[in-house]
């Protein structure tokens, strides 16, 4: 959703605290402690201002796609292995997201809180799996998770199919790929050149 290194996230958290947009406190986490960040009223105001701005366009950071661009410099075995690894990563990320959804659906979880009208604004925050919950936000969280899981499922499907296809290639520079290349490009054009259903053709 927003790729970034752990170091960058840590610096951003400190910056938010420095701006007065969040507070931080240590809390027990087993035998150790962890930092819990809480948004402040000033932070909520800044968040509302940001949400009123025009969003940036989508950005992709999928190394498997980059490797496809330069696949003619690789052997078929390396290419296929890269495709399989990318599919496996997408599959693992999808499974992790589904696990989160299952937690939301579990008895006593956020959806139960939402449906029973408990743990919302103005009430004591209820915890689930050791974390405070915000059931009143679940409708927008569900939309975000829907987008993420669909994208991950598409990535898994595409890279799995691509690995199966490239596994049968004699080489990555074989002229025999030419007819399939035409079929693929024509299929892309046919699939996406027509106007969306909400936009009638002229």
For each feature predicted by the language model, list its residue ranges.
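Amphipathic alpha-helical dimerization/coiled-coil segments
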Residues: 49-99
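Short, flexible helix-adjacent loops and helix caps
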Residues: 21, 27, 73, 102, ...
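Histidine kinase transmitter module recognition
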Residues: 1, 86-89, 151
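Structural signal for well-ordered, non-membrane alpha-helices
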Residues: 17, 44, 91-98, 102, ...
